[in-house]
């Protein structure tokens, strides 16, 4: 892909939006030298649509009127009407151009934005898990347990970073250890298989906890991922503690598989709130042991660093990084950019 031409640069100010199923976060980037200014975070359920949220929560409350916008959304981007996953909003870029005074609208995948973020993430915004030394221009991977399991790669070629989104959250996870073979029969399946998102997300954390309880012959007492996490970290509940241990193991296995696929000597990054909350569990031996247990390539795996992304607004940071210097990225915009 050729470098971005001057005609593809966006005009400032640029509204940046990280649109999730529950929350929508907005920042504004005044120029290419500025840091993004966080404007607001809104609950998607409180607004009938994204245009209403932008108008009422952003435009009506700031004198900085954006000319362009880049939105990162959870869901496939196809056509001129883009429904969001786990949310009633539908993004209609042509309507945004007509109603909100914008001249340029770009819509990308939420984990493309996470991939853009890890291109320039500094030490203050990541927590190392285990050892390993990063190769600055080598491929990288980001995965994030959240509402689902997001996955993206970041590949350097032709003097540019190329984000590579996908549906890696739906890869198979299978049993390996003796304990796995006891627990896995009780994990909820999708058409007979256990996919990544059946375990490695908030809902999956609950699925795993319930499976452990069934394997132990006891009734589950928790139904909220936050309760399982807090009880597991404190060690006050044996099943919750094992849930975090197995969750870390399975996350390590999947992260290791993705590292091999991308030859991610630039590092594997764990994004999202769940990863941030369970850092103590991830620093226990299980995660790195599972990550490195990839014979015949265990020696290679020991050299690949792993991090938890601790930036509070990583997706917005990634969008800002791209907006400042789009020529540094091979971001495909066919069918994902609308202009007035």
Swiss-Prot record:
It comes from the Bacteria. It is found in: Cytoplasm. ATP binds at residues 17-22. GO terms for cellular component: cytosol. Keywords: ATP-binding, Cytoplasm, Glycolysis, Kinase, Nucleotide-binding, Transferase. Its EC number is 2.7.1.2. Signal peptide: none annotated. GO terms for molecular function: ATP binding; D-glucose binding; glucokinase activity. It catalyses: D-glucose + ATP = D-glucose 6-phosphate + ADP + H(+). Gene3D superfamilies: 3.30.420.40, 3.40.367.20. GO terms for biological process: glycolytic process. SUPFAM superfamilies: Actin-like ATPase domain. Belongs to the bacterial glucokinase family. HAMAP family: Glucokinase. This is Glucokinase.
